[in-house]
Amino acid sequence: MEKKRNSTTKMRLTCAIIFIVFTYLYLSCYQPDLLAVAQHALSGGMTQYNYVLFPILTTLVLFLLQCGVFAITRVKKRFHALTYFPSLLILAIITDIPTDIDTYHSLGSWCWLFPLLLILYSGIMWVIRQLEAYEPDIQKGLWLSRCTWINVLSLDVMILLVILIGNGNDVFHYRMRMESLMCEGKYQEALEVGAQSAHTDSSLTMLRIACLHKTGAMGDKLFTYPLVGGSKAMIPDSVTTKSMMWTTPKWMRKKVRGKFYYVKPLDYQLNAFLLDKKIDQFVHLVQSKYNIENDSLPTHYKEALMLYTHRRLHPKVVYRNAVMEADFQDFQTLERKYPNAMERNAALRDTYGNTYWYYYLYGKE
């Protein structure tokens, strides 16, 4: 009898450790920013998410719920992992956060699916409880008992389902992480979020542009990121381009006679022309605001001026820079090397994907 009790205790302890570690790490490392925006949206911005307390308290509450389910069902053999089902179901629901939560506050299909699953679960657990008395005794294996392995695998399957149900949209995760950092004034750190990913949307583009403006690096770094939406993505429209937690600067919200009237900062104006590939307008503005012969001119402005000089038969401005000229010649040489359009695009993206030249000739607005 004592051996049986020790074996079931080890099995239950193993499951408890797996559940607690997963729940805490899942909430504190993978989903914290989505939970932050959910709380912000549901409270109308009146409350602030606590990144330290929420994962701890939620993990504790869900574990106590499992303890309660176990106390009621007393299922402690090969189906013990199912006592974690209600806790994992709730975890799945609170992390299944829609990307439009700022405008659509609803549990969606969970309104009827949650009670239905609990009813089915109750029936299944009742049947299991009746059959458990006829189960053979737990046989200890070389390391862990067979019963322990069955429960661990069952728990892993439910954990996998939680991960699949939770919001795993990488771009949405990037956006919410950036907004959290931007709310703290950490613009440089925000620029590192998703920097190696090729995935983006207009809202992420807008956030990166705002951070580059704050750090004074828009003219040097903008086209090192994947961009979509052209100049329209520079300012939120609350539909396709928006922020959920970060408060936009006042100049983006200024109204004149009921209509929005933007007085854009200079780097916004210049890069708006570049994003829309209007290099003639860009050249006209940049030469009136900068000494274009100065080596301190931002990198993308130099690239745009070099491109303009080469693509216009009678350029109004002839930009000369030996280093930039050599780079552009190498760019053109690589272009001519690949007759196949897909191979050419891939080769140029790998080597010059962080230049304005690549964006202008191959990028999408």
What are these regions (language model features)?
Residues 1-86:
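Membrane-anchoring hydrophobic segments
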Residues 6, 74, 130-150:
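Membrane-interface anchoring determinants
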Residues 22-28, 86-97, 156-162, 338:
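Aromatic-anchored segments of alpha-helical transmembrane domains
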Residues 41-51, 104-112, 142-145:
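Membrane-interface segments at the starts/ends of alpha-helical transmembrane spans
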Residues 81-139:
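Membrane-embedded alpha-helical segments of integral membrane proteins
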Residues 143-169:
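Internal/C-terminal transmembrane anchor helices
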Residues 168-289:
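Soluble catalytic regions of membrane-associated enzymes that act on cell-envelope
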Residues 251-365:
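Solvent-exposed soluble domains appended to multi-pass membrane proteins
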